């Protein structure tokens, strides 16, 4: 198994995927990136069992194969390279040799078959939304989500999809944010609670991204697909509180203030 790839191109993709990897994995194999090579397509995956993300990279190769490479060690190694083509060669002695213009490096690898497979969604519903709109929705709500382990449903963002609009809600019982978009909609009504970690990953990737994101979801999992990248995560199980009950319906008091002045005064 052999392939050639740009050092900066690979590093950029791996740094994004590295955000999935936990510092306290229960399975040692999860400390690795999964490399799945199929000729000129290299699919790289990272997982913590709750969240799995994969990206497809274009490489120069005619081979096929699957290996698991130590994530932190590979990232640290790639950071030392200037932009240049790198040649990866998988040897029979359980090492992968990385050849650069400045020398060769050898990393031990594990059997890719040990890496857990991403969850396949059964009978999912699907909604499409522009990446920058989704990133804005996450930015405007995620900060209000709680951190209380005793109330897990409030530790994420509540997604409400309907044919009329998409609504995103977060609360920690002290503050509440509701963000609604009537310019995008779903084919049918759906509700689910997204955990913080995958939302933080999506927020960073999708900021300013005008690619369309396909959101697929069922009762237990959600999948976000865009631009050769796929993120699958487990949803938070439970019923979200009736947030509408705490939003005043008839409040005669209204204050209009310049945003910049208000921000300066409360800093």
What is the role of each PLM region?
Residues 1-267:
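Structural preference for solvent-exposed beta-strand-turn elements
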